[in-house]
Curated annotation (Swiss-Prot):
It comes from the Bacteria. One of its GO terms (biological process) is fructose 6-phosphate metabolic process. Its EC number is 2.7.1.11. GO terms for molecular function: 6-phosphofructokinase activity; AMP binding; ATP binding; fructose-6-phosphate binding; identical protein binding; metal ion binding; monosaccharide binding. This is ATP-dependent 6-phosphofructokinase. Pfam families: PFK. InterPro entries: ATP_PFK, ATP_PFK_prok-type, PFKA_ATP_prok, Phosphofructokinase_CS, Phosphofructokinase_dom, PKF_sf.
Length: 320
């Protein structure tokens, strides 16, 4: 019988994490459970830094970006002894389960705790939208709005100067954020990790656009594919058009979450409590076709594949 739970945020922050914490806390309290917030993710779990939360602890949090519990990278959590200390800390406080909000690294920590006998529920919190078993992650749509706003501003100045602009978008090894932003921002060219990249082919496409009368262009590219400053120099040398690169960086993670992320986070947080009360542990929550779903967290990490939105890319190419 679940009586006390913990909740933490881990890895890179994402808009909507506070809304998810709020959803977990208020749904749990409504069901008569006690909730402890863990500061700074798995690091705080190991260092036994927890605080009991009530309804007022999460007041005015639904609209705040970031995570008021804090987050930290803690690679030492891979060590089984470190996890044993974390589990002992939770048991000392009488915790029966843990809700983890974060990306795939956070899920891995939850998976390892589950394998050691401590039930966890994972909620997908990352702007990268790279979590298996869900159509969208908490924070993705807010970050999308931030990126599109930046692209709109870049288009203003690119048009004025007949310039080629490269905009580097977060996403790690998933191109969803780049792809969605490129469609919404009307970018002429898209470079994502799921599709083989050739700078020569990109230049050929840019030249073809110039031949058709294009005065300016925006290239959206996912981070880690190449050095965008070097790419800008190459494009400028080959096209004889002024080319500049803009790295949006961590601004994409900040800001007040948009309505969809607030709703998604709230629904997922409450659903996590439903699952725990039904006796489910070792699960991760997702949304598919606008319905909340849950999967075995071990299976999600080890066996499930995340499909690439190839139809989105096909659409974008038709609109160049």
């Amino acid at each position: 019988m679940i009586k006390k739970i913990g909740v933490l945020t881990s890895g890179g922050d994402a808009p909507g994490m506070n809304a998810a914490i709020r959803g977990v806390v208020r749904a749990a309290l409504t069901e008569g459970l006690e909730v402890f917030g863990v500061y700074d993710g798995y690091l705080g779990l190991y260092e036994d830094r927890m605080v009991q939360l009530d309804r007022y602890s999460v007041s005015d949090m639904i609209n705040r970006g970031g995570t008021f519990l804090g987050s930290a990278r803690f690679p030492e959590f891979r060590d089984e002894h470190v996890r044993e200390v974390a589990i002992e800390n939770m048991k000392k406080r009488g915790l029966d389960a843990l809700v983890v909000i974060g990306g795939d690294g956070s899920y891995m920590g939850a998976k390892r705790l589950t394998e050691m006998g401590f039930p966890c529920i994972g909620l997908p919190g990352t702007i990268d939208n790279d979590i298996k078993g869900t159509d969208y992650t908490i924070g993705f749509f807010t970050a999308l709005g931030t990126v599109v706003e930046a692209i709109d501003r870049l288009r203003d100045t690119s048009s004025s100067h007949q310039r080629i602009s490269i905009v580097e978008v977060m996403g790690r090894y998933c191109g969803d954020l780049t792809l969605a932003a490129a469609i919404a921002g009307g970018c002429e060219f898209i470079v994502v990790p799921e599709v083989e990249f050739s700078r020569e082919d990109l230049v050929a496409e840019i030249k073809a656009g110039i031949a058709k009368g294009k005065k300016h262009a925006i290239v959206a590219i996912t981070e880690h594919i190449c050095d965008v400053d070097e790419l800008a120099k190459y494009i400028e040398a080959e096209t004889k058009r002024e080319t500049r690169a803009t790295v949006l960086g961590h601004i994409q993670r900040g800001g007040s979450p948009g309505p969809y992320d607030r709703i998604l986070a709230s629904r997922m947080g409450a659903y996590a409590i439903d699952l725990l009360l039904q006796g489910h542990g070792g699960r991760c929550v997702g949304i598919q076709n606008e319905k909340l779903v849950h999967h075995d967290i071990i299976d999600a990490i080890e066996n499930m594949k995340r499909p690439f939105k190839g139809d989105w890319l096909d659409c974008a190419k038709k609109l160049y």
